[in-house]
Each structure stands twice: as C-alpha cells, then as structure tokens.
C-alpha cells in the first residue's frame, strides 16, 4: 500500500513535467505573439511581465497580408489532396492485401510504391516544376493538389494494406457466398471495419499536406494559390525576421 501511495505522486509529477516540457515551446510562441519587438529580444526573457499588444494579429489578419485567403487555399488543397489520396491509396492497399499477382509481382509493386516515398521531395521538385510549367499549372491550387496527392498515395497504400491484412478474408468470402459482389463486400464490410485505419491515415495526410513548404514555395507565386506555410515564411526577409508576426 505504501509503495502504491508513493508511486502515484511520482507518476503524477512525471506527467506534469512531460506536459510542461511539451507545451512550453507552444506557450512561449503564444506569448511572443503578444509582445512588441523590443520585449521579444529582451534579456533576460520576459515570460509574463510584459505589456500585451495585438499589433501582430492586426498586421496578420487585417493589414497587409491576406492571411484568410491563404488559410482558405491551404484548406482546399489539404482536404482535396487528402480525399484523393485516401480513395486511390485505399483501393491500392486493398488490391495488394487481397488479390493474387503472378509470381513475386505483388512484392515488386509494393516495394516500388514504397520507394517513391523514400525520395526527398527536393529531388523531384525541379522535374515537377518543369512538367507543371509545360501544362500551365504553375501558380494554381491544382498543382499543389496533384503534388500532395502523389506524395501521400504511397503512405496511404502501405497504411491501409496493413489494416486490411488484419481483417479476416472469411468475412468477405461469406458475404460473396450470400450473393454480394467483391466491391459490395468491400464497401459494406471491409471499409466499416477499417474506419480506425482510415481515420489515422487521414490525420497523417492532413498534417503532411498542411505543413508542406517546399512545393508551396516553388509551385505558387501569388495569393491566388499561396498557402499558410508560404505566408508564415513571409516573416523572414534578407535582413530580419518578424518573429511576432510568425508567432501570431
């Protein structure tokens, strides 16, 4: 009993310390967004004893930068690319987990799909830019949607393949014995059972697409297609960095 009573405070303090350690950068960023430039660079740092200001938020949302436009662009690009990647990758993952292929072709296809995700995006950004320039897609949201979808499909394929392999084939076979089709059993039985996998995979795709910066800089030029990551980068110039704006 004494040992258990001793463990509880230790566990609680460990959790509190972990939370503070994890949240400190975020909380400090929030405090920076309310500081004037002089207080941002004050030494020693001022964590609480500063005069708050909304200057950076006004500059971000209502002054010179169309931040709401960038938010809408990011939302459109992220949501559409995630939906497309989920549709294509889920079907591909189902195919690799259920269908038969000649010889070792299935493993070659699976490795090829995985290898496309191994490449750093910076390796293919120039060919992609030339390709999109040829078709007049540079500075459009469609270019970002295609790029993000292409890079998320391998991830979705491998994630959903592993989830489908954990679902017994007998469930589909019994449904098809009762007269259902392959796609019918996939839609009515497999997909509902794979909802946790779809949810986890979609969250990862949303995060990857929302935070992507390289293609957002290379493939967009104006506010018509600029995203949030590009807008944040506007805070860094040749001579200074507007930390208050970027924190806001």
Explain the meaning of each model-derived region:
Residues 2-248:
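A structural signal for multi-pass alpha-helical bundles of membrane permease subunits
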């Amino acid at each position: 009993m004494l040992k258990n009573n001793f463990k509880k405070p230790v566990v609680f303090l460990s959790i509190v310390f972990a939370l503070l350690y994890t949240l400190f950068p975020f909380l400090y960023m929030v405090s920076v967004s309310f500081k004037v430039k002089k207080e941002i660079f004050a030494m020693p740092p001022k964590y609480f004893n500063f005069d708050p200001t909304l200057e950076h938020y006004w500059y971000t949302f209502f002054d010179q930068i169309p931040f709401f436009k960038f938010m809408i662009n990011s939302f459109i690009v992220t949501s559409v690319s995630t939906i497309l990647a989920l549709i294509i990758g889920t079907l591909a993952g189902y195919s690799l987990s259920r269908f038969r292929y000649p010889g070792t072709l299935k493993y070659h296809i699976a490795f090829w799909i995985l290898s496309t995700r191994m490449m750093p995006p910076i390796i293919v950004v120039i060919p992609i830019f030339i390709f999109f320039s040829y078709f007049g897609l540079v500075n459009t949201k469609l270019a970002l949607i295609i790029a993000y979808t292409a890079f998320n499909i391998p991830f979705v394929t491998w994630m959903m393949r592993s989830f489908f392999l954990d679902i017994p084939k007998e469930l589909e076979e019994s449904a098809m014995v009762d007269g259902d089709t392959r796609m019918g059993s996939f839609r009515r039985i497999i997909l509902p059972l794979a909802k946790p996998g779809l949810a986890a995979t979609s969250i990862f795709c949303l995060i990857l697409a929302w935070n992507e910066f390289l293609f957002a800089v290379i493939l967009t030029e104006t506010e018509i297609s600029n995203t949030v990551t590009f807008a944040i980068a506007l805070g860094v110039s040749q001579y200074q960095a507007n930390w208050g704006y970027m924190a806001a």
